[in-house]
Amino acid sequence: PPPTVTPATPVAAVAPAQAAEVWQLAPAVHLYPDASGPASGGPWLILLESTHPTTPLAGAVGDLLDKMLRALGLHQHPQVWLAVLQRPGGLPMAAEMAGSLAPVDWQPLPAQLAHTLQTVQPARVLLLGQKVAQTVLERHEPVGQLRQQRFDLAGHAAAVSYDPSFLLRTSQPKKYKAQTWADLQFAAQLPARSK
């Protein structure tokens, strides 16, 4: 008799990735875990959009961000954290695109931000980028009007500046990089807790 062929077990179809309906936040990443300098001024939390939520210092944007933070001496600070936001309508990023073998645990922004603030206990929060600043602070002004001001974010002092990706594509990089440097210095001078 001819050999019998057992039909292959059907493979469950993988559901297509669903677009996010609300702003989402990835877990905070410890930027400089090997830093051995003093934690002067307390922990930092940086919020921005990035195509590398688990490795935010990757790529040209990450390289510029790293240079900005190093200029401020934060590469020696043991408590610098960064969390990436994703806009509504964005598809969840595949792990390999995120520079990690682990999936990105995107969570709705309000709950994840509250959890991140509670966990990190930042002395200051730096909001980079117009949409990030407007969404987190629930404001409508452009970055140019929000920068060089102190905001309260659930009891934590917060400051706003330009996103590194904007600095790479603007036609006036010197102007905006100088303003961003001033904003970083402003953020570094913020008291640990917002009044």
What are these regions (language model features)?
Residues P1-K195:
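A polyanion-binding, active-site-adjacent surface
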